[in-house]
């Protein structure tokens, strides 16, 4: 039964699953920071002419009453895919990469990754040039992780916690890797503007969610700042980014159990059977901050992402005008009493509001997984030990409520993030 001039609105809160990834090149452990993945703004190309080969992997055992990750995030406009249940032993993520600086002005990096039983894929294929060896400007092109900042970009990559943050799953369907070009500026300012660490500006193909195969190139900007607080109150770092996408015919499966985890939206050019489609504009805004407090070994981190969408949302059951907002983030506290031990907790949340106006609005909302709505949230705690700087052994426990179902999780994880396996200079 069709509805005319129907309206629908709803709200939601947090969840998700896991997908661990390794950087598009050199992945390293910082003694008081998480394992670090590189994006287009910070490619792991040697500073001087030479070659590096890198590898990293994370394996784990997860025990839970319900599937991990949760089959779906209700009330979130996504791709409708259902991730593979990863309870038991699994390869969370593994990568193998190489980077080379051919001359002081030209370098390149390539990285291949694999998640569990999924096929291997190219995570990075990046060419980078600079006008001089000591230039503040770098121009890169190819495939790479989007420049979101290390807090948001690295979450879910050899992270201390074993699940992809809820907002990353909702906003990007996990990792956001695109083809494009990026101009980086890394100034060395003094005085009143010494806090400004860098600016990135790029154009990206936007073929992966939340973009689509037929989307226009997406402009993306990111700024990074850092400094010391007054009165010896510790050091801080902060990042913010913005991107505008214009997907056309971005399909999503009417939620089903056999769609598998995907990053590229199904096409809307043929039949609308078991598909919902979106044409419109997507605005993505994110920010993150990290504070190394005066307390020894204590670091506090916060991150948030907002996704606004407006346009046409339709299926075989109706055609509507759509406006939606998805927002979420997390707060994290880390205590490292020594360089060998990590104790951390993370609280996540996710919220959504949606408005559909037009024939069949309620049916379209149901097809698009916007109904029924249940709030979601997650709390996680971990204890980690580093017998070697490149190895993290961690025990994790958490509780989440997603799609109206509670789930308790206990995990044992091994994360290996070495420095270069092979390094040559010339």
Write out the residue ranges for each language-model feature:
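Detector for outer-membrane/organellar transmembrane beta-barrel domains
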Residues: 46-48, 52, 69-73, 228-369
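Outer-membrane beta-barrel biogenesis signature
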Residues: 35-85, 150, 248-251, 341, ...
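Outer membrane beta-barrel
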Residues: 45-65, 83-206, 213-232, 335-337, ...
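Gram-negative outer-membrane beta-barrel proteins
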Residues: 61-67, 116-120, 147-151, 189-191, ...
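Bacterial N-terminal signal peptides
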Residues: 21-31
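Outer-membrane beta-barrel "beta-signal"
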Residues: 183, 385, 406-426
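Transmembrane beta-barrel architecture of outer-membrane proteins
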Residues: 92, 121-123, 205, 217-219, ...
